[in-house]
């Protein structure tokens, strides 16, 4: 599991970092942390924050978070009925 997440971080990090070649790795990670709204110590920055921020970085502000689109419902009533099993796929 850790190996898969590491590969995912590297895949997402490489093209983003290449766009900012003047920054070293720590400076770039600090920039990503600040962009994502993380205000703790850099050592506490999780891979989840990096992965989701890198995935969403160049998307529209109102875009749906990856992984949540499949569960998205336009209206609350439909979502509730589907969750209770009244509406089947």
From Swiss-Prot:
<dbReference type="InterPro" id="IPR038134">
    <property type="entry name" value="YihD_sf"/>
</dbReference>
<dbReference type="GO" id="GO:0005829">
    <property type="term" value="C:cytosol"/>
</dbReference>
<comment type="similarity">
    <text>To H.influenzae HI_0845.</text>
</comment>
<dbReference type="InterPro" id="IPR009383">
    <property type="entry name" value="DUF1040"/>
</dbReference>
<dbReference type="Pfam" id="PF06288">
    <property type="entry name" value="DUF1040"/>
</dbReference>
<protein>
    <recommendedName>
        <fullName>Protein YihD</fullName>
    </recommendedName>
</protein>
């Amino acid at each position: 599991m850790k190996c898969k997440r590491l590969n995912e971080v590297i895949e997402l990090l490489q093209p983003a970092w290449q766009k900012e070649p003047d920054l070293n790795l720590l400076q770039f990670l600090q920039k990503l942390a600040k962009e994502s709204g993380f205000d703790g110590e850099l050592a506490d920055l999780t891979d989840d924050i990096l992965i989701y921020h890198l995935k969403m970085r160049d998307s529209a502000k109102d875009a749906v978070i990856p992984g949540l689109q499949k569960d998205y419902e336009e209206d609350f009533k439909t979502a509730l009925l589907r969750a209770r099993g009244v509406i089947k796929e």
